[in-house]
């Protein structure tokens, strides 16, 4: 008798400004979950926050030209019950079916990027519901989403970070003293965002206030970081079902000559639409530098109390590696660096997502 398949809910979309990136990531996950091992239940979250039963066809979640996918409200409306005695039950909400159990899932893969998904919110719901899930828990997800607290935790562990100033709601701009501690260029960012959305490179102070206003379109709390001169690299961290935590090879992102001017950086269009960046996987670094980055990545993973996976971004400077940020649910598109880094060491995409699901099931539920 064949072993029953594990029922995996893949959740995507969401209310954040990274809605479309989440959809594309989920399409790649759907494409690579082994149908002999897993029965997939796709759940889309609209930009308004409604949960609907999605399509199992990954092509519906693909980028077409420069058109990005999104979740519409046409599917059957549903909700995940937060009652742990009904762990994993997905309940219909539509008239005539309200209360009917549409499916009961064994584990959730929350392929959500940004606010209301990657920031500890859905992780809290899944903890209440008593459902195992892929990725870090509530604390690590919340801290990893907020660049202020990411760096506070990293600094507390003695890990190398750059200088930043936090502008909370009600604080309009930098003081002269803060400007003197920063050095141009600076990067102005939403404190709780990803995919390089809302980020501006500021080369002169006259442009600062416009950059802050732009970032505040996405988050009332803003980070201003000193620009760091160095090579931009990334390292993936993966937890296995036995609890072993490993780091991937290092990848380097390069803006090729002719792709832009001195102000070019790895922004949203560069990542997902324009195909102008060049990547070295593995990066062409001295072995000792690569080993140091891998060690720092695992230490950063531990500093935030992550589980499952994370991608740690660095600058390699003349004085050594500096951690830029941690992404607790990195992109899973076909061109995303996290699966590419693991693919370079023989962990193909299908094996990667299976490992993540198996690790979530091994971890179980409750305090740990």
From Swiss-Prot:
HAMAP family: Dala_Dala_lig (MF_00047). This is D-alanine--D-alanine ligase. Pathway: Cell wall biogenesis; peptidoglycan biosynthesis. Residues 151-358 form the ATP-grasp domain. The lineage of its organism: Bacteria, Bacillati, Actinomycetota, Actinomycetes, Mycobacteriales. Mg(2+) 1 binds at residues 313, 325. It comes from Rhodococcus jostii (strain RHA1). Mg(2+) 2 binds at residues 325, 327. The gene is ddl. ATP binds at residues 179-234.
